[in-house]
């Protein structure tokens, strides 16, 4: 599924369109449509922890989100070996409106309870 990027991905401002591909129930791959060398592994944060935040009105307008919209929230993960060393960026979620194929990265306030590089091992069941 292709998405137009309405709010740039930090550090990748030239990425204007991405393709989202399911890997499994928790992970997805997001790749730049213009540059196959730019790709990210994304994770469903709700598979790991409680995760909630408000999407600002300005972002809702850009993505044309309303109360009926189907949205997908994913976070960038840096996969490591062993997998327990993988880190997740909970402070910069990707928001996808699957109704109109628009996407944005949202940067949460630094006062949030979420981190930029939290080890996945903190949330894996032992």
Curated annotation (Swiss-Prot):
Keywords: Bacterial flagellum biogenesis, Chaperone, Cytoplasm, Translation regulation. It holds the Pfam family FliW. Its main location: cytoplasm. GO terms for biological process: bacterial-type flagellum assembly; regulation of translation. Transmembrane segments: none annotated. Disulfide bonds: none annotated. It comes from the Bacteria. GO terms for cellular component: cytoplasm. The keyword Zinc does not apply. The keyword Chaperone applies. InterPro entries: Flagellar_assembly_factor_FliW (IPR003775), Flagellar_assmbl_FliW_dom_sf (IPR024046). It is found in: Cytoplasm. Acts as an anti-CsrA protein, binds CsrA and prevents it from repressing translation of its target genes, one of which is flagellin. Binds to flagellin and participates in the assembly of the flagellum. Belongs to the FliW family. Interacts with translational regulator CsrA and flagellin(s). PANTHER family: FLAGELLAR ASSEMBLY FACTOR FLIW. This is Flagellar assembly factor FliW. It comes from Sulfurimonas denitrificans (strain ATCC 33889 / DSM 1251).
